[in-house]
Amino acid sequence: MKKGIFLSIGIAVLFSACGNSIDEKTVKKYENQLNQTVKQEIASLSQDSGIKIEFSDFKCNADGDFIACLSPNFKTLTKDNNDEYQELFQAKNIKIRSNEIYKGKANASISIKEYYNDLFKNQKSIQSNLVFEDFKLGEKVVSDINASLFQQDPKISSFINKLSSDSYTLSFDNSINKQENNYLDNLDIKFYNAKLNFNTNLNINLKEDLLNYLDSKGIKFNTQTLVMDKQAINELLNIANYEQASDFSNTIQKYIILNNFKIDSTLKTEGVFSSYIATAKENLQTLKAQSQNEEQALIFDKALAILNNITQNDDYKLNLDLKFKNIPVSDYSTQGIDSIEKLSINNQDATEALKIILPFIMFSMLMGGASF
């Protein structure tokens, strides 16, 4: 459900732009289109899922080369078994800031390639930022989380309850930079407060031919309404959803190259997991000693080294860096695990261990699916 809300607002950021000098008229036009798009997406989501969303209109203003917008008091609610609304989550403010501003002179629809060429005429990077301030789960959600853990240790139960009850900042930062024949797209997602800091990063290359493909599918940018052709987009997405082996899925993947995916996370545990971590380390030592072959020993040795590094003090730190080969996503079906160039976890090279263990994970998943 949350994914749908984030996607709704993200689409509004990605497919909204405005005029040349960011004057008051341009800002107002951007503001109106943003609110209209978000309301349409919320109405569709509410109709399909029965979720109630309390949303206040964005108010926008010029901020240098950017337009900054704010919407206060965001809430999502859903009905429980007693047909009463329960809060899923809320945010004190939603903030959007973007320099994706069309500065051309066209008065009609233009191709996607024309649109991006214009965007990069006077700026090296297109940046969009979406922030949920004081993001907090509803009381019923927190209660359900705690009930599902079946945790007997009162210290851990109290710790998890506080962690799930806290307020956080949730942010999405996306930047696109033009290179010779492609676009470098960098997405950062951050979820943090004083106790937990969880960051992910995805870095990809989009080939310029992707824009030509979208143009061939009739997707254009309307310079008057400041949005992409919604009907053409929906038609393209329908193909993606219902015809997985279609021209869309086969062609689009040829234009996308994953560079790397990262996770950087810190959790202040206050030492509540110490006894469990000690037991886990002892078990890994035992399994390593009892290994039947070198491959098993490698897996347990790497796991132990990584666990030691993550838990060397009460502030647990996880750093994961997954690098992919310089091949299009369309080649992954034939390359398989070899699509991965290197996996590092807390500066430990876990590539070979991953290649050994992943087939067993996939087999377990298939067997689990078969028994369903």
From Swiss-Prot:
The keyword Lipoprotein applies. Keywords: Cell membrane, Lipoprotein, Membrane, Palmitate, Signal. Residues 1-17 form the signal peptide. It comes from the Bacteria. The keyword Signal applies. A lipid is attached at C18 (N-palmitoyl cysteine). One of its GO terms (cellular component) is plasma membrane. Transmembrane segments: none annotated. Its main location: membrane. InterPro entries: JLPA (IPR032077). It is found in: Cell membrane. It holds the Pfam family JLPA. It is a lipid-anchor. GO terms for biological process: cell adhesion. A lipid is attached at C18 (S-diacylglycerol cysteine). This is Uncharacterized lipoprotein Cj0983. It comes from Campylobacter jejuni subsp. jejuni serotype O:2 (strain ATCC 700819 / NCTC 11168). The lineage of its organism: Bacteria, Pseudomonadati, Campylobacterota, Epsilonproteobacteria, Campylobacterales.
